[in-house]
Amino acid sequence: MKFTVTFLLIICTLSAFCSPTSKPQRHISCRFTRIWNIPSCYNEKSDLSEAWLYAIISVMVFCSTILALAIYPYLDIGWKRIDAMNHPTFPAPAMLPLQQVVAGGFVPANQPRPTSPTPTEISYFNLTGGDD
């Protein structure tokens, strides 16, 4: 109820504020709603007064702000999560030990080569038992 009364009061105030004291000059060929005539009517006077344009823009900004404030609590943003403050600020240390760099740039022959990581996918042939 309070929101409705406030909204009606704003509309009444804007309509009283935006009512022109003298009739604006009307140019039928340059209407505000005919966007395709903008290049030819750029310097012409609009059929809508500037006060009405400002009022329309103000109402649109007000409505979009209210909509954004209504939607914001339902957004799942990272910093609003319950466990957002429980995450570490620095990454965990590497699980694999770093390899020692030898002066010559190669691994000596007596050290085994590092094993290749296992593939993440399963081969079709391993599932069927061969290449039938």
Swiss-Prot record:
Protein modification: Phosphorylated on serine; O-glycosylated, but not N-glycosylated.
One GO cellular component term: host cell membrane
Membrane topology per record: Single-pass membrane protein
Family named by the database record: Belongs to the adenoviridae E3_14 family.
Broad class of where this protein is predominantly found: host cell
Record keywords: Early protein, Glycoprotein, Host membrane, Membrane, Phosphoprotein, Signal, Transmembrane, Transmembrane helix
UniProt name for this protein: Early E3B 14.6 kDa protein
Signal peptide region: 1-18
